[in-house]
């Protein structure tokens, strides 16, 4: 087949969001687009203005939170930390952070614990580079990238091992090879999901630029709109955008015109099959940074609370959906719960996940070195627990 790459034109506002989504976080690096997927999918339900307002509010809260000079780390056991700020995207990786705040799991070590959500690369960059958050959820390649470029942080854990899915109008598609000769809609060209899709295709002797028609769009919202309005048959998306979108396509009045949509190929399952490994990828986790970095007692206490919170979320998806949706208006309780049930989540301390992280990073280095900052992180990157 001849090479076919289509780029869908979108309105100015959508193109501006796409430019933000693909903008360099630091020289040579980009921000993976899955972190904004849930907000984009929810906007499909008519919450676009609420999403913009919430994103702006979160960014304002994050930036204003570090106006004062950072205080010296408090010693857990003798004095409570005055304030801890936890931050994450509109995605599953933030669930345990929200549970920690909602249940007061760190009340014994901090006077005040707050959660804020980040939506744009500018917000994440400000929070990370200025050390405004104490614990920050982000994609695992991005934390390696920032660390390799000199930012002081430590990877605490990996909690997300599988959120990328092919969504298709046709049932029965089991592997990426089944998409040969078909069009695949892809948000965020050159970003992490795109890179992983290409990597997994090429490991199976599939040239995605020749054997498929790749149609790049500005955001997951655009991809889901194309599916729901029958203008596309297949798309690569991430949870909870997948779950929210599938729920929306089955609800009135959209269900009147929307086709049946299916979770098709799990990229995590493809990863395991192609590399003969466990079917999971260390996609996202939580880092420690800011004024409390180096407070080992606090780090250990946080890790205990994070594991407890993650276990609760996995055991109580419906209740977790309720508390997450209360704090992130763009998500629905049902969509959050569906995503928890569908995806692979397992809280693993960074040092214990190191071998899987390094294998993951090595594949990205060979594919697109800038995604991880050009090298493997050293020992100081991994929290030992």
Regions found by a protein language model. Name each.
Residues 1-14, 24-29:
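N-terminal secretory signal peptides
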Residues 11-12, 33-83:
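C-terminal segment of N-terminal export signals and the immediately downstream linker at the start
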Residues 108-109, 271-276, 346-353:
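Short, solvent-exposed loop/beta-turn-alpha elements that line the ligand-binding surface or hinge
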Residues 141-142, 221-323:
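Pocket-lining segment of extracytoplasmic ligand-binding domains
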Residues 291-367:
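Secondary-structure end/capping motifs
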Residues 100-103, 127, 145, 182, ...:
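Structured segments of extracytoplasmic/periplasmic soluble domains
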Residues 63-65, 69-217, 233-239, 256-265:
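Short, glycine-/small- and polar/acidic-enriched structural segments
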Residues 358, 362-385:
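Conserved C-terminal helix/tail region of periplasmic/extracytoplasmic solute-binding proteins
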């Amino acid at each position: 087949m001849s090479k076919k790459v289509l780029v869908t034109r979108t309105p100015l506002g959508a193109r501006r969001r796409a430019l933000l989504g693909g903008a360099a976080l630091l020289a040579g690096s980009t921000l993976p687009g899955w972190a904004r997927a849930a907000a984009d999918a929810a906007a499909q339900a008519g919450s676009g203005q609420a999403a913009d307002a919430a994103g702006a509010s979160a960014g304002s809260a994050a930036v204003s939170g570090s106006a004062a000079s950072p205080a010296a780390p408090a010693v857990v056991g003798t004095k409570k930390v005055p304030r801890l700020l936890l931050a994450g995207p509109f995605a599953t990786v933030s669930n345990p952070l929200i549970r920690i705040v909602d249940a007061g799991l760190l009340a014994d070590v901090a006077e005040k614990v707050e959660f804020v959500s980040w939506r744009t690369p500018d917000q994440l960059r400000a929070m990370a580079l200025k050390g405004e958050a104490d614990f920050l959820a982000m994609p695992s390649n991005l934390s390696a990238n920032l660390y390799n470029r000199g930012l002081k942080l430590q990877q605490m854990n990996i909690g997300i091992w599988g959120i990328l899915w092919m969504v298709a109008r046709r049932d029965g598609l089991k592997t990426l090879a089944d998409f040969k000769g078909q069009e695949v809609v892809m948000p965020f060209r050159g970003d992490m999901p795109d890179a992983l899709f290409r990597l997994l295709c090429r490991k199976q002797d599939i040239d995605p630029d020749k054997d498929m028609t790749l149609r790049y769009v500005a955001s997951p919202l655009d991809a889901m709109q194309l599916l729901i309005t029958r203008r596309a048959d297949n798309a690569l998306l991430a949870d909870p955008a997948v779950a929210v979108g599938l729920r929306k396509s089955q609800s009135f009045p959209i269900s009147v015109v929307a086709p049946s949509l299916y979770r098709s190929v799990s990229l995590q399952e493809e990863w395991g099959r192609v590399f003969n490994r466990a079917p999971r990828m260390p996609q996202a986790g939580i880092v420690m940074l800011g004024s409390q970095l180096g407070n080992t007692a606090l780090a250990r206490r946080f890790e205990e609370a994070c594991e407890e919170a993650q276990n609760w979320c996995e055991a109580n998806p419906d209740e977790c959906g309720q508390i997450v949706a209360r704090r992130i208006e763009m998500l629905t309780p049902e969509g959050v719960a569906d995503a928890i049930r569908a995806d692979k989540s397992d809280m693993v301390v960074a040092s214990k996940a190191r071998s899987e992280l390094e294998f993951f990073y090595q594949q990205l280095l060979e594919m697109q070195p800038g995604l991880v900052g050009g090298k493997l992180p050293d020992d100081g990157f991994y929290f030992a627990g």
